[in-house]
Structures are given as C-alpha cells and as structure tokens.
UniProtKB/Swiss-Prot annotation:
Enzyme class, broadest EC rank: translocase
Pfam families linked: Proton_antipo_C, Proton_antipo_M, Proton_antipo_N
Cellular component aspect of the GO annotation: chloroplast thylakoid membrane
Location relative to the cell: Plastid, Chloroplast thylakoid membrane
Keyword annotations: Chloroplast, Membrane, NAD, NADP, Plastid, Plastoquinone, Quinone, Thylakoid, Translocase, Transmembrane, Transmembrane helix, Transport
Chief location bin: plastid
Entry protein name: NAD(P)H-quinone oxidoreductase subunit 5, chloroplastic
Gene3D superfamilies: 1.20.5.2700
InterPro entries the UniProt entry points to: NADH_UbQ_OxRdtase_chlpt_su5_C, NADHpl_OxRdtase_5_subgr, ND/Mrp_TM, NU5C-like, Proton_antipo_N
Assigned EC number: 7.1.1.-
Example GO molecular function: NADH dehydrogenase (ubiquinone) activity
Origin superkingdom: Eukaryota
Source taxonomy: Eukaryota, Viridiplantae, Streptophyta, Embryophyta, Tracheophyta
GO biological process, one term: electron transport coupled proton transport
C-alpha cells in the first residue's frame, strides 16, 4: 500500500500529454492531426480512465485502513525560507479525484458526438484535458502555494472554455465576466495565504493547522487580523463556487458548449470553492465568526439561487441557478460544521447535475434540427414542450435527475439534502426554516423546467419562422460560430469517416429550419400542429454517458445512508471520511435509527411533493393557459384583490427574471463607476499632466522665437540694448529708493 501512495504524485500529470501533443501536432503536422482528430478523444478518455482506476484503488485502501499519506519535496532557497512541493492523499482528495474522473470521462465521451461538427474539436479536447489536469492538481496539493497555482489554472481553463465560441460577443463577454469576477476572489485568496504565512511561517496544511491552533490556544495572535485573513481566504471560495455576492458570472457561463457546463457545474470549477473550505475547515473552525459568516453566505445563496431560478426561460440558466442554490446548501453545511453532510451532498449533486446538463445538451442538440444554431432559440423552454414523445430516453433520465434534486427517495440527493436540513435545526431555527422552504422551491422550479420541456405539445411551429427562402444552418468554425455559404450543409466536414466515438450511425440534419423574422417568445396555440419537422433522440454516444450518470443518480446515495441498526453499518461514507471526521469532531456519531430517519424524511418529502404539485398545477398544459412562462391563470375572476395579487406576482417574476437586479446594480455602480474614474483619469492625464508638460515646451518655443527676432547679430546692437537695460534699471532703482 505504501508503494501505491508513493506513485500518487503522477495523478495530475496523466491527462497532461493530450493538450501538449495536440498543440505540438497542430504546429508541426496540422493536416495529419486534424485528419485523425478522433484519436485524441480516445486518448483523453483512456488517460482519464487510468486516473479513475488509480483513484478508486486509493479510496478502497483508505476505507480499509483509514490512512492519510503526505509526501513533500523541499526546495531550500536560504536558511530562513524553503518552498515545499508535494501531494496529500486523504479522504477529501480521493473523493474529489473520483468525482473529477468519473464525471470527466462521461463528459468526454458525450462531447465526441456533441462537438463532432465543430471545427474547434481538437481545441475543445485540449482544453478539457488541461482542465482535468488543473483540477486534479488542485485536489492533491499539500500546501497553499500549490493550491493557488492550480487554482489559477482552473480559472484559466474555465475562461477558455466559457469563451470557446469567442467570436460570439455574448460568449466573449461571458468569459471576461467570469474571469474578472473570479479575480476579485482570487486576489483575496492570495492576500489570505500571505497573511497566514506571516502568522504561522508555513504553507503546509498540517503544520499550518497545528501552529495556528497552538497560537489561538495560547492567545498569541491578533484576533482581528486573523479574522481578516480568514475572510480573505473565504473570498476565494465565494467567487469560485458562485456564492453571493460574487455569483453573477455563473449564469453567463452557460454561453460555453453544454458539456463544459456539465463539467464546471458538477465536478470542477464550482466544486473547487467547496473543496477549499472543506480543506481549510480545521483552520476556520477555531474562528467562530468565520464559521458563522460561511453559514450566512450559504443560506443567502440557497434562497437567492432558488428564487432566481423560478422565472428563467433558458434551460441552462435555470440549471445554473439551481447549481448556485445547491452549492449554498454545501456551504451552509460547512459553516454549521457538518463536514460529512457537505461532502455527501457534493457527491450526490455532482452526478445529478451532470445528468441534467448532459440531458439538456441532448435536448438542445435535438432542437437545433428545427431552429438552427441559435442558443436563444434552442435553449428557450418557451419553444419546447412535448419532447417526451421525441426524446423518450432523455426524458426518463432527465426526470431522474429532476426528482433527485427535488429530494425524492431513493434517489441520490434525497439522502444528502435531508442530512443538511436536519442539521440546520440544531444550528439555527431561522436558517432551518429558510433551508426547508427553499427545498420546496427547489422542487417547484426543477419540475417547472421538466414540465415546460417535456409535457404538452411542441411549441415551435415553422410558420412562425417566416420567410420564403430556406436558409442553411450555422457551422461553427475553428474560432467560433461562422455562417456557411448558401446551399451548404452542416454535415459536410468529413464524409469519408464515421463521426462518432461509439457508433457508426450518421444522422443528417433536417433542412426545414427557417430564419425567424417575428418575435419567437410568443407561443403559438396548441391546436395548431402543422409542423414540418420534429426533434429526434440523440446518438448512442450521447445517450451512454447519460445512462451511466442515471445509474449513479439512482445508487450513489447508498454510500452515505446513516443507518446503524442491529450491528449492520451501511454508512460507507463515514468510514471513508473517518480520518477527517476524527480530526474535526473526535466524538462525532453520524448514525441514525429508522424511527428518527422516517420522522425527518416524511416532512422533507412532503414539502418536495407540495412544490411538485404547485408546479404541475401552474405549468402542466392541460390545466394552464400560461403563455410566455408567466404565473397567471386565466380561470380566476378579476377583482381589486386579484389585480393587486397579479401585480405582486408580476413584480416577483420580474425580480426573478432580471436576476434580482444585482447585475444591473453592479453594472451601474461598479462598472459605471470604474468607467467614470477611467474617463476622469484620462481627461486629467491628457489635459492637466500633458498640458503642463506641453505648456512648458510651448512657452519655451515662444520665448525662443521672440528672442530670435530681437537679436540681429551685431555687437553694437547688443551693447546698445545692454546699456539701455542698465539705464532703465538704474532709473527705476533711483525712483524707488531716492526717498530713503
């Protein structure tokens, strides 16, 4: 076992050859590299599978032995300072490694089909493999300096992937927004790291925790400065995990390809913030104010994310706000000290959310055959509906993910969310009420997404896409979206070979799509069904990862069932996390009996079903005449009270749809303020600073020109002027001082 741990340092570097070889191949042998491009997808999956097997083996060793392994290489710069590099293998590392690799493999397989017609295919897989390398390096780091290095690499990869189609202005703006927002948190993280190094003299986690605990115990530190440094460290997690108030980048990150959304929201970027807080929890737990701040930020994010998801029309943005809310649950659990519950929910949510995002990608893929390449249309739930008849497998798996996030047993998120809800009562009744109410909101908005997408009738009618001439679909060039020439087809990239990784079937894209010339948000009447094309189910290459993630969603919750009945211990997760739990809570007991579990579960499931019922009542087409996704039913008679109620509902709807006006506030006060300051600085620099400098030169030039014309070149003239000046000076002197 010791030898296995000794080779664990290689984990982050196994996927690294793929982006390096792709880059070298495109420079040295571009034609051959592009011709055999699907070979790189196979290598990406193969190398990440090796990491997954290695990570699973390490996890089994840890479950059996409850061991933690750390290895450090020291680079001594001078006698007073040495920089250490190493790797740490503990339960948190193994959990994150398995999450990254399992979800990453599914996303890579899925992407082989999803990105098959994109000329940036090779660039996409290079970025994805480098993303996996960065995240694996982050979770295996043994000190804060290494974490910061890989932390920045994760941010870089997310910037590249969110802006993958950067020729689209919205995608370019989205990646810049994500980058700048995360720079705020990253700057705080760097300052916090340097602050704690100044306090403890170490970057290594074990030394840092031990030294800091001794300093706190002996009251040898400035508590205010320590709190400030801890807040700065936490700021990095707030930005990376899209917690309030640095959450604004997350919905815009949906401008990247859908597989990227699945990876970012499930196991990489947003999970990095939760990982950082979990890793530093032994540091935070001795600072009570920080733990309370973490829980407050978590509960605000829980409620805010859920309310902002209520009115979203874009299916990916709705799921993005769902991610924000669920990350808030994890942050709340960490702030309450519920280390096990937070990591359990991280695991279950990762598989459920990856399933939902890949399912949404399958839906978008099928809608593009009708509306063409237009994210504003293909991702709009107002143009969907009735897809259960056309994409039945996607519908079943999407329903599994939806019910899991709703908290319906026996699906994965039921077990983890229930633990967080129960722990919240022990921490704060106010927090508990908000958390339980938000669980009902979660069920409401998730089932709203499901009903708008799959129930009713297909809301796209080609008569709404006016125009006598058919127009081709868009192809996506190497550097983004680019219109193809007329009468060209999207599937002409390579007609001589199969385009899919697991299947040789080709599906031609229907050419019946038309450009839309009228507002597409007005949903046509359901009785008008004259459509000339319908969506179809995705290829097996996309369905296989969705099916596997569906199995994870069904069964992964079993690892954390907290029952210990009659000597039968089903709680694998507690045994897995034993070293970390014992470090944080030496006398903790996570087991429950059946009676206690059933009492809590009945309440949470009832709340979830109530949210589902309200969503079904409002959004199921049979019972509702909703149009444009509003919350108004026409069967209620109008009256003064009803009109007031409608105004309130519309106000809430506008508040939710417009992201609580937080983005507008930031744009007006922060972005506008910075632009105003920049304009003033530019004016001051050009008119004042440059004016002074240029003014000296102009004055010198004028004086020189004047002197040039006064001097004639004769000595007699110079003597005459000299004597005249002296005479005038003497005359003035005599007149001024003659009285004295």
């Amino acid at each position: 076992m010791e030898q296995t741990y000794e080779y664990a340092w290689i984990i982050p570097f196994i996927p690294l050859p793929v982006p390096m070889l792709i880059g070298a191949g495109l420079i040295l042998f571009p034609t051959a590299t592009k011709s055999f491009r699907r070979m790189w997808a196979f290598q990406s999956v193969l190398l990440l599978s090796i990491v997954m097997i290695f990570s699973i083996y390490l996890s089994i060793q840890q479950i059996n032995s409850s061991s933690v392994y750390q290895y450090v290489w020291s680079w001594i710069i001078n006698n007073d300072f040495s920089l250490d590099f190493g790797y740490l293998i503990d339960p948190l590392t193994s959990i994150m490694s398995i999450l990254i690799t399992t979800v990453g493999i599914m996303v890579l397989i899925y992407s082989d089909n999803y990105m098959a017609h994109d000329q940036g295919y090779l660039r996409f897989f290079a970025y994805m493999s480098f993303f996996s390398t960065s995240m694996l390096g982050l979770v295996t780091s043994s000190n804060l300096i290494q974490i910061y290095i890989f932390w920045e690499l994760v941010g870089l990869c997310s910037y590249l992937l969110i802006g993958f189609w950067f020729t689209r202005p919205v995608a370019a703006n989205a990646c810049q927004k994500a980058f700048v927002t995360n720079r705020v948190g990253d700057f705080g993280l760097l300052l916090g790291i340097l602050g704690f190094y100044w306090i403890t003299g170490s970057f290594e986690f074990r030394d840092l925790f031990e030294i800091f605990n001794n300093l706190i115990y002996n009251n040898e530190v400035n508590f205010l400065f320590v709190t400030l440094c801890a807040v700065l460290l936490f700021a990095g997690a707030v930005s990376k995990s899209a917690q309030f108030p640095l959450h604004v980048w997350l919905p815009d990150a949906m401008e990247g390809p859908t597989p990227i959304s699945a990876l970012i929201h499930a196991a990489t970027m947003v999970a990095a913030g939760i990982f950082l807080v979990a890793r530093l929890l032994p540091l935070f737990r001795v600072i009570p104010y920080i733990m309370y701040l973490i829980s407050v930020i978590g509960i605000i994010t829980v409620l805010l994310g859920a309310t902002l998801a209520l009115a979203q029309k874009d299916i990916k943005r709705g799921l993005a706000y769902s991610t924000m809310s669920q990350l808030g649950y994890m942050m709340l659990a960490l702030g309450m000290g519920s280390y096990r519950s937070a990591l359990f929910h991280l695991i279950t949510h990762a598989y459920s959310k990856a399933l939902l995002f890949l399912g949404s990608g399958s839906i978008i893929h099928s809608m593009e055959t009708i509306v063409g390449y237009s994210p504003a249309k293909s991702q709009n739930m107002g143009l969907m509906g009735g897809l259960r008849k056309h994409v039945p497998i996607t519908k079943i798996t999407f329903l599994l993910g939806t019910l899991s996030l709703c908290g319906i047993p026996p699906l994965a998120c039921f077990w983890s969310k229930d633990e967080i809800l129960n722990d919240s009562w022990l921490y704060s009744p106010i927090f508990a009420i908000i958390a339980w109410a938000t669980a009902g909101l979660t069920a409401f908005y998730m089932f709203r997404i499901y009903l708008l997408t799959f129930e009713g009738h297909l809301n796209v009618h080609f008569q709404n896409y006016g125009g006598k001439h058919k127009t081709p679909f868009y192809s996506i060039s190497l550097w983004g979206k680019n219109g193809v020439k007329k009468n060209s087809c999207l599937l002409t990239m390579n007609n001589n070979e199969s385009t899919y990784f697991l299947s040789k079937t080709k599906y031609p894209i229907d050419k019946n799509g038309r450009k839309m010339t009228r507002p597409f948000m007005t949903i046509a009447h359901f009785e008008h069904k004259a459509v000339s094309s319908y969506p179809y189910e995705s290829d097996n290459t996309m369905l296989f990862p969705i099916f596997v993630l569906g199995l994870f969603t069904l069964f992964v919750g079993a690892i954390g069932i907290p029952f210990n009945q009659e000597g039968v211990n089903l709680d694998i997760l507690s045994k897995w996390l034993a070293p970390s739990i014992n470090l944080l809570h030496p006398k903790s007991n996570n087991s429950q009996d059946w009676n206690e579990f059933l009492k809590d579960a009945v309440v949470s499931v009832s709340i979830a079903y109530f949210g589902i019922f309200i969503a079904s009542f409002l959004y199921k087409p049979v019972y509702s005449s909703l149009k444009n996704l509003e919350f108004i039913n026409s069967f209620v008679k109008k009256g003064p009270k009803r009109i007031l109620w409608d105004k309130i509902i519309n106000g809430i709807y506008d508040w939710s749809y417009n992201r609580a006006y937080i983005d507008a506030f930031y744009t007006r006060f922060f972005v506008g303020g910075i632009r105003g300051l920049a304009e003033f600085t530019h004016f001051f620099d050009r008119r004042v600073i440059d004016g002074m400098t240029n003014g000296v030169g102009v004055i010198s030039f004028i004086v020189g020109e004047g002197i040039k014309y006064i001097g004639g070149g004769r000595i007699s003239s110079y003597l005459f002027l000299y004597l005249a000046y002296v005479s005038v000076f003497l005359l003035v002197y005599y007149l001024l001082f003659s009285t004295f």
